[in-house]
A protein has these predicted regions:
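Short, Lys/Arg-enriched N-terminal segments with co-localized hydrophobic residues
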Residues: 1-2
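C-terminal helix-cap and adjacent tail motif
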Residues: 5-15, 20, 91, 156-182
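A short beta-loop-alpha structural element at the N-terminal edge
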Residues: 21-26
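A structural motif
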Residues: 28-36
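Small-aliphatic-rich amphipathic alpha-helix that forms the alpha element of a beta-alpha
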Residues: 35, 83, 89, 99-145
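Glycine/small-residue-rich phosphate/adenosyl-binding loop
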Residues: 43-113
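A glycine-rich helix N-cap at a beta->alpha junction
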Residues: 72-79, 147-169
Length: 182
């Protein structure tokens, strides 16, 4: 195992407080260029990233789309950028003919988006940025705010910035609790 990869995985934290320091669209492009290597169903690459830098749009998402969860509202307001991770619906699991390859249905597209979101977060950490993956939001309201097409579904909100501080790692379960060998 490459030591740098191990360090990145172990060192990444959910960052909820950011320095008052901007990040640029170019910096976000670098993160997404790395995240684009995330595996996906038959390499369908269904995940999309919407970088929100516009303060009014970011405020609209924070104030109207996170179901009144004040903690997340504050995080989004304070983050220099917000990435809305989406996926193209109806592509994962399907063959070019339209037939399903498995009985997993549309659950797999969410799995693909999750892998991509984690890859995005690890890439951001490697490049010196902090992220937190948020799941409390009204996906329809976020989609409306971004004027997404019908085939694009919101998977996660990911504030991005420079960490104010690196929090300690929360306790982890023992491997013996996580792994069953048969």
């Amino acid at each position: 195992v490459d030591m740098q990869t191990k360090d990145c995985i172990v060192g990444r934290r959910s960052i909820r407080k950011y320095l008052d320091r901007k990040i640029t669209p170019k910096q976000l492009e670098e993160i997404v260029s790395l995240a684009s290597y995330a595996p996906s169903w038959k390499n369908t690459q269904v995940t999309r990233y919407h970088g929100v830098f516009d303060e009014k749009l970011k405020a609209k998402i924070a104030d109207e789309c996170v179901l009144g969860f004040v903690f997340n509202q504050k995080i989004i307001h304070r983050a220099p950028a917000l990435v809305v991770v989406t996926y193209k619906h109806g592509i994962s699991v399907y063959e070019k003919s339209g037939e399903e390859s498995t009985n997993k249905g549309d659950k797999w597209e969410v799995f693909d988006a999750g892998i991509a979101t984690q890859t995005f977060s690890l890439a951001a950490h490697e490049l010196g940025y902090g992220t937190v993956i948020m799941g409390i939001f009204d996906d329809k309201k976020v989609a409306e705010a971004l004027e997404l097409t019908e085939d694009e579904v919101v998977a996660a909100l990911v504030p991005v910035g420079f960490a104010e501080k690196e929090p300690a790692a929360p306790p982890r379960k023992e491997v013996s609790e996580l792994l069953t060998i048969r």
